[in-house]
Amino acid sequence: MLARVGAMTTAVLGSAVFWAQQKNTEPVQANLNLTNTPSTDQSSSEYELKLVQVLFRHGARTPLKSIPDVLEAHWVPDLLEVPDYTKIDYVVTDLQGGPRPPSPVEDSYRVRTLAGGTYPGQLTTLGMKQLYDLGLRLRRRYIQDMAFLSPYFNNKEVYIRSTNIVRTIESAKCLVAGLFQQQQADTVPILTEEAEKEILYPNYHGCRLLKLLSGSRWAESSTLPDIASDLQSIQSVLGVRPHQHLDFILIRDDMVARQTHRLPCPAALDSWRAKVEQRAVDMIWHIYEPSNRENLQLCVGPVLHTLLTNMETKVQGNTSDSDRKLFLYSVHDTTLMPCLMALGVFDMRWPPYAADITLELYQHRHNRQHYVKISYIGQDQKIPGCSDVYCPLTEFQQALSMYALPEESYHTLCNRRADIPTH
């Protein structure tokens, strides 16, 4: 049984199929009705940019599983062609620079093929372009407008880590191609971790307590009165037989993948799209239970701690790592959502393909204090507990202290009460 990456399924306590069904789908467009101010250049004379960290979701992909009992879309190999403009010289390694670890998640996708001949969960040509375009957006800001990064890839400036899944690795590659326009002084290393130790998504295989706590909440999520009623209705509308497993996350995964790639969708879904989006998010909200501090700690505590540690290293400036200017993390929707919940800015919308959370660390030119600015899909966010969009680092650290967790504490917590029976 493996860690979940994306759309969590009822097989939360299952086996390799559990991996394959895990990842959730993606809204076609960001469509954020935010009240936050758009991300603009720093009140530039006052703040000097010191560090950028970007958590980004992979691009558009094939679905993880098709809705049962409905006409399947044909996911043909032509949809996965690699554009020349995304090609770079890169290598995938473990965190120490050794061989890439095995990927049980990817292996689970390749035990079956979708109609049309491709595997589930594969980055498509459209997804590659989406990440290339995100790289272009970062290039405009950090190379052209702010002259913060070198115009070519430099391993001393840029650190790249991805979950050990082909679509996230390829997404990282495409972003780097857009960011540096295929100009590189070094081979681009993309670092990965073995599945059991992965912290870049809620790891239900590596953290027994998380699996225990989430298992019952996953089962509950489809039985909540409003969700259960709507699920019964849509199952009837689609003509899905009662014995087939179906939930709104699975429906959304297939629906949005088809919609994004302009492939035929069951006509019966047309009037249900908004409801499917809403109920899928309702399920995730229930499963992650953001009001439960411990649950978010187990989901993304080590990720948040890593982001804070990178900032502290930059502030201290006394190690070779302090030369880094950009950290890139290629992750999943199920990484971004609990991070947004912990930050207090989740807008109850599913993160679209190529969505990003960007953390910028600044130093004020006059008082020499450090500040953090967060944006989500290019929109500045005022974090609860912060006095301004430019949040004093001490305030930001305090705001995340409830959820950030060093890996040692994380492992201790994961192994605590792991033998408590589910309820």
Model-derived features: positions:
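Signature for phosphate-centric chemistry
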Residues: 2-423
